[in-house]
Amino acid sequence: MQLSSTKPSSKTREPSTAQDIVTMQNILEKLYRAESISRQESQALFGAIIRGELEASQLAAALISMKVRGEHPDEIAGAATALLADAQPFPRPDYLFADIVGTGGDGTNSINISTASAFVAASCGLKIAKHGNRSVSSRSGSSDLLSAFGIKLDMSAQDSRQALDDLGVCFLFAPQYHLGFRHAMPVRQQLKTRTVFNVLGPLVNPARPPLALIGVYSPELVRPIAETLKVLGYQRAAVVHGGGMDEVAIHAPTQVAELNNGEIETYELTHRDFGLDTYSLSALQGGTPEENRDILASLLQGKGERAHAAAVAANVALLLRLFGQENLRQNAQQALEVIHSGQAYQRVIALSARG
């Protein structure tokens, strides 16, 4: 489906033709009857949403109807496809690269594990194009933290690609690439509940990575999001939830759904699988962006808390597996060695210097 390239106006606009109106009404009626809609119908619906073509009441009803019934992977994939089609362009690399990202919304207020993991993974030789936004549940989201480090959030797509080439890591700020999200924001704020938009962020990286490690805020989402990644054509990915966190956990078992060349395997991981000690969730508590900056600066220079290093090592270990390094214990040890060397912090400094 060809999505309009016209910039959305500040006011709600009606679909352009009578046929569009009938089709959209049919889609909405199916949702009101608690029926699933197809990937194509979902793509049409979310295309209309990000162009500002739905009334607030229609948008609210559609989102709540999907939430109460439970979103189907095809519906989530259709929504992601619409958002990616509307995204600002990014020069996609032809080499293997990944995203490591969480939905947020887990309410744990932990340190920025996935952001730290991106820099450590790059220092392990991987290429990471991290998609992120401001905080959802914690006091400091990935964008908040990077700003505290002096890293430029509105770096151009070309400059971000150059950073990915040179440093092995770049950060793509969601609002810079997904302008249509703003049409849904007032309704989302009024609803004050999670909707499909809460899980779309990790699925709409404008760089379109073939690999991804995605954390979700609920164990019930692990398998459906893996199914969605399959529909979207990811080569290899892992969806995780660990003990209330949208990360690989070291304080509790982690539920994993791993996609590998079209096949999905579900399994459980504990700290023992990585050869790591266990630590309590309270040991991973974060704070303000400035406090988290200081915590991660110490960690990435090799001077941080053991619990923080272990948490990052576990996530990097699973990310390394997605690139074909299958031994999680060896991967975790490699990550710890990189953390203790201070190499990862040099990448933070180098990325900040490009601002």
UniProtKB/Swiss-Prot annotation:
Binds 2 magnesium ions per monomer. Anthranilate 2 binds at R188. Its cofactor is Mg(2+). InterPro entries: Anthranilate_Pribosyl_Tfrase, Glycosyl_Trfase_fam3, Glycosyl_Trfase_fam3_N_dom, Glycosyl_Trfase_fam3_N_dom_sf, Nuc_phospho_transferase. It comes from the Bacteria. One of its GO terms (biological process) is L-tryptophan biosynthetic process. Mg(2+) 1 binds at S114, E247. One of its GO terms (cellular component) is cytosol. Its EC number is 2.4.2.18. Keywords: Amino-acid biosynthesis, Aromatic amino acid biosynthesis, Glycosyltransferase, Magnesium, Metal-binding, Transferase, Tryptophan biosynthesis. Catalyzes the transfer of the phosphoribosyl group of 5-phosphorylribose-1-pyrophosphate (PRPP) to anthranilate to yield N-(5'-phosphoribosyl)-anthranilate (PRA). Belongs to the anthranilate phosphoribosyltransferase family. This is Anthranilate phosphoribosyltransferase. It comes from Pectobacterium carotovorum subsp. carotovorum (strain PC1).
